[in-house]
Design a protein with these regions (language model features):
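Short, conserved catalytic-motif segment at the N-terminal edge
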Residues: 84-97
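Hydrophobic topogenic segments
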Residues: 1-48
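Short, well-structured active-site flanking segments
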Residues: 115-132, 218-222
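Structured C-terminal helix/loop/strand segments within mature extracytoplasmic catalytic/sensor domains
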Residues: 45-72, 82, 99, 162-165, ...
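Short hydrophobic alpha-helical segments used for membrane anchoring or interfacial signaling
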Residues: 78-84
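Active-site helix/loop module of the DD-peptidase/beta-lactamase fold
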Residues: 126-147, 173-181
């Protein structure tokens, strides 16, 4: 009864808003709406900028090349750095500076961190398989650095991360400047179509820094990582590389191949990234890379 009386009193005491009050309310609403509309594109622009690498380089050092014929059915880019001449050849500069998940190409640096922390060593990198049934037969076995890199064994590198811990991993990310350095999605998944992202240009820069040991890591550790990604070696020529494939909803949408070629007195560093709704695999990125390098007379197949 008291509640009913209170409601009646409130209704009887209600006064219709004046025209001026309505105008003030509408004006305030309009200002807020305009502010929100103004902020939204700013936030979108900021997010977009975060996805791109801000590359500070003289345009004279870059040769923009048309390699679209090699990328039939794919979006993506090819980046080549000539160490001797300090020059770049790039197909699709927009995609070359676009950051995306590194997937298994990141294992190059994860191995390096594990070596630096003595989780593994150049002489003893053996890890025992824990018996978990993995989707690839090659993963269901014991591994060392070389076999794990060759078969791209996820659990091997996840174990390195587990022993490293988040704090140490973040410090290493910052030390080498790995892409956006974001591992917030967790130690098991951050490099697999998740929060960690890097551009093709940055991939080449990091490979160059690794090759020259600009990180000032133990030389034997750097050499161990180089050896683990050596694919072919012959007199006066060596070919190094690592693939990566990103899968979303059962489809391969993000393919990588990164590496370098040593020839006589020069070294060429490369990255190929392909993206599509399907079939964008590291293997297909590798085939594209081989065709380009062959046509450039850098490596014959």
């Amino acid at each position: 009864m008291k509640q009913m009386q209170k409601r009646i009193i409130n209704i009887s005491s209600y006064k219709k808003p004046s025209v001026w009050k309505k105008v003030k309310s509408f004006t305030a609403f309009s200002i807020i709406a305009v502010m929100l509309l103004g902020i939204t594109p700013m936030l979108s622009t900021y997010a977009a900028e975060q996805n791109y690498y801000k590359w500070d380089i003289s345009p004279e050092k870059i040769d923009l090349v048309d390699l679209s014929a090699y990328f039939d059915g794919y979006e993506g880019s090819f980046v080549l750095y000539n160490l001797k001449s300090d020059t770049w050849s790039i197909y699709d500069i927009d995609h070359a500076t676009l950051r995306t998940s590194p997937n298994s190409t990141y294992k190059i640096y994860d191995a390096l961190f594990g070596l630096e922390e003595d989780i593994i060593t150049p002489k003893d990198s053996f890890m025992t398989w824990n018996g978990t049934d993995y989707p690839f037969e090659a993963w269901n076995a014991n591994h060392n650095l070389y076999s794990a890199m060759d078969s791209s064994v996820n659990w091997y590198f996840q174990e390195i991360d587990r022993q490293l811990g988040t704090s140490a991993l973040k410090n290493y990310m910052k030390k080498i400047g790995y892409g956006n350095e974001n591992i917030d999605s967790g130690l098991s998944f951050y490099w697999m179509q998740s929060t960690l992202k890097i551009s093709p240009v940055e991939q080449v820069q990091l490979l160059t820094d690794l090759y020259n040991n600009n990180f000032d890591f133990a030389p034997e550790n750097v050499n161990a990582v180089k050896d683990s990604i050596c694919l072919l070696s012959s007199y006066r020529k060596s070919f190094y590389g690592k693939t990566g494939t990103g899968r979303v909803n059962g489809q391969d949408v993000n393919g990588w191949f990164v590496g370098f070629v040593e020839i006589d007195e020069n070294t060429y560093f490369f990255t190929t990234n392909i993206q599509s709704n399907s079939n964008a695999t590291g293997r297909n990125a590798t085939e594209i890379t081989k065709s380009i390098l062959s046509d450039l007379n850098i490596w014959e197949y």
